[in-house]
Amino acid sequence: MPLLVTSASGVNGNGYGALLAFDRNGAPLGVFCNDERIADPRGLVADQHERLLYLNSGQDRVLALDTGGTVVRDTGPIEGLNPGGGNFGPDGRYYVGLRNARTVTAFPRTLDAPSEHFLAPGIVPFPRGFAFGRNGRLFLGSGIGPTGEGDNTILAFAPNNDMPSRLVSDPGLSPLDLAIAPNGNIVVASEYPFGAADAVTTVREYDAADGHLVRVFRPKDLAEFRRPRGLRFGPDGNLYCVAQDEVMAFDFANGECLGTVVQFPRLHGQALAFFP
């Protein structure tokens, strides 16, 4: 199963501005889709049921690709959308973090109708990843934006309630992305202080019930692990995190770093997915 990575460009990183593919040994397979509607790609989520890949494009649109890399669904350009990460919700809709509006919005899977704000605009200073837990709660990373605005926490939203509760208070956290682990806990890619040359980069696991820090995943000496971004659990159960020049793997069961599975200079990865 190929590993796909969105490589940033522009203010998000001096990458390739493309959706790149790698084989199971980490060897590059080239660009997965050359469609001109893909520019500075961000969020990336595989829908294994429909065998589609949803991609948030820096061209202010959301796309869905088939297994051959052809765009088969397109919202069309949406002025000011500026999408970040994406995830499917318990209602089946495709949810997207909005950087300008500082909220989360929901599109129908068909991408043929306008989205609806799931949370109020400006709910956080700068959204940095989100995911739905087992009980339908939404966990939203509130991080630091490109100009330094923001805070460093994880907020929780109960179903049918857009009033947040501050779940995580961790002085070592500056979230970049988050995912729900097989055990129901929250795992978060962190770079603290955000943007600093000597930032401490980790993946941190928090209890979904009370937000306490469970454990910290570290690269040790196996990789530089600069500018960590997207997180994804693979079909093998391992936890993967894309970064500036590599994709790292961690054994989630014992917390050990397995090293790099992809090494690619200037990758500046934003998100990753195993597809098809």
Residue ranges with predicted function:
Residues Q244-P276:
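Blade-level signature of beta-propeller repeat domains, shared across WD40, Kelch, NHL, RCC1
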Residues D23-A27, L65-T70, F107-A113, F157-D162, ...:
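Short loop/turn segments that connect beta-strands within beta-propeller blades
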Residues L4-S7, Y54-L55, V96-G97, F139-G141, ...:
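Residue position within the beta-strands of beta-propeller blades
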Residues S9-N14, Q59-R61, A101-T103, I144-G148, ...:
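Short glycine/acidic-enriched loop and turn motifs that connect beta-strands
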Residues G17-L20, R61-A64, R102-A106, N152-A156, ...:
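A short loop-to-beta-strand structural motif that recurs across blades of beta-propeller domains
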Residues A27-E36, T70-P77, A113-P121, M163-S169, ...:
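A short beta-strand motif characteristic of beta-propeller blades
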Residues N14-Y16, D35-E50, I78-Y94, P121-R137, ...:
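Beta-rich, blade/repeat-based domains predominating
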Residues M1-G30:
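An edge-strand/N-cap motif at the start of beta-rich repeat modules
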